[in-house]
Amino acid sequence: AELVPAWPLDEYAFMLAPGQFAGLVAPQSSGMSGREVPGELRERVGPLLGRDGDGFVYIPDADMSRGLAVVGAPGMGKSALLQSVAGYQFLEQAAPSGAAAAPGRANALVVFEPKKKGAQAYRRVWQEVAARVGPPNPLYVVDLADPACRARVGLVRSDQSPRARAESVTDALERAFESGAVGAASKEALVTALWAGHYVDQDVLAAARARVPCPAFTGRASFVRYGHVLLAGQGDEAGVALAAALRDKLVAPGADEQSREVAYRLETLYGKHTPGQRDQQVKAPRNKLAQLACFDHLFDPDQDTMSFEQILERHANVVLVTGPANGHAMSDGQAELLSALLAGRLKNAIERICDGWQEQARHCTPIVDELSILARAAPEALRWFRDQGRSYGVRPIYATQYPGQVPAELRTSLLTFPVLVSFKADEAGIASEIAAQLGVDGSVWQAADVATLQPHHAAVRSSVGFASRPAFTVQTLWWRDDPARWAAAQRRGRRR
């Protein structure tokens, strides 16, 4: 018997939905149609983004100055784009274009980079610009994990009082851990120990060493190391010995009122307590401070240590390596904590010296290569850079491979930056969020459009002169593929 199909089609035919058929016979009407690059972005209006069949494509400075967000799965091109954007700003430093909204020479780049390899890439692009155009502003690579690194940035203000420094470190610890992890009692103990640690000198160490031969009582260290000892980080006997030696100094004849207050505070830790009672009191804060104790070199400034104020005033560039470097380890928790301290210090420095910078055409560009690290530890600073930083000349650039790990409120802020560049997204929910932002002008974007992007291809939502333009797709360019062509494309119409 003849086999009769269940639908009236030839055996070699197959069914198509109307939209699928339209996409085959008229590709311009398919789901990825209408993704043409706005004509204004063909002009050199900012950093080079990529190219398509019609030529180069640029990111507009005027809109990027209000915030650039870059998201995408690992290996898709996020970091390469950030390096290219930084290279454009190095070019502006070396040979200012004079174009409206361009950053020019008066622009300090502060890069939060979790990988040493990434930091080396920023150095290479800086060197490329220096060789082809002339030297940009100085660049410093700071390996936070490496005590031997000659370039250092102070984590606390040198002009702060001992108590203020103790409170700033305690606040950073509180932000870096989960809400409630640093309770009121732990916070009080941390401030006391860190405050008292400032008063340790060679006489105090000698007196403590006479009581207990502890390695921490030899050489020179910072208030963080001594604060850790006072929280029994080297054992209860060492803590008792250091506290006793400090007490003798702080209440000696002629001691000022502040010294006596520190001595009084120490009594809350080393008064009438048994070792067991004291351990219950200091165990939790000690464990928190231990994250910083092995980075003592970052809290012991010398004549070569730079402050963020100096970096900003000189419009210098600094890459902060917030990960392992040169054989020195750094855990994720330590990276978050140090990043929180650095972001807080940068925000404080900007507030102090950069008021009115936007009107003076002076800028600071924080580049955060992996937002998920800072988002957990310093969300307030990140929000401030975008929401309040504009009048201070702040031009934030945030990127992440893991937008799902960024808290929802901050992720929404990220995806609504004036310029959004999205490489392939692996998570379905994130792809949907990005697609919704790409289509805010009414154009149709689906999660699949974002999830199926090829490596080094990006979907871009931008605007020109604050007027929204339809999102588009483009192949991004890696500056190292052809440095000469990359530099030439960036420098069209540029004058020295």
Annotated model-derived regions:
Residues 3-41, 45, 234-249, 280, ...:
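Conserved P-loop NTPase motor module
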Residues 48-51, 61-64, 73-74, 81-394, ...:
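P-loop NTPase motor domains
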Residues 145-147, 402, 426:
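Short, solvent-exposed coil/turn elements at secondary-structure transition points
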